[in-house]
Structure formats: C-alpha cells, structure tokens
Design a protein with these regions (language model features):
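Active-site residues of response regulator receiver
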Residues: 55
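Conserved sequence signature across two-component system core domains
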Residues: 8-9, 34, 52
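Short acidic/histidine-rich motifs immediately flanking catalytic phosphotransfer sites
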Residues: 47-51
Length: 68
C-alpha cells in the first residue's frame, strides 16, 4: 500500500511539480493538496498522512507555524 502524502505549497505550479515527482514512485501517493498552512491544518485534523511535503513561506499560516 502506498504511503499517503500531503503536499502544501502556495504556488500552484510548485504543487503540480511536487505531485508529479511524488507520483513517479509507486511507493507514494499524493492523497491531498493544500495552498497554505490553514488549509493544511484543516486537512491534517480530518485525515491521516504518512508524510507532509511543506513549503515554509506561505500566506495566512506559514510552514513553520503549521509545524508548531
């Protein structure tokens, strides 16, 4: 069973690039995407992921704030 990954980045282009890279490996599956820390926080509170790929500089809630 592939590991479920949450991809978080405010840039739509970077989200797409990261997802494309992750999807090339059958051991991983992009389960969800978020455009900022608040959206990611909501997803994390409702779902379980094996890993999170996280941008640091984002509006509303940045990556470091999300980690806290």
């Amino acid at each position: 069973m592939p590991k479920k990954i949450l991809v978080v980045d405010d840039s739509a282009l970077m989200r797409r690039v990261l997802c494309d890279i992750i999807d090339t490996d059958i051991r991983f599956q992009v389960a969800d995407r978020a455009k900022d820390g608040l959206e990611a926080f909501d997803l994390l509170s409702r779902n379980s992921y094996d890993a999170v790929v996280l941008d640091v500089n984002m509006p509303r809630m940045n990556g470091l704030q999300l980690l806290q």
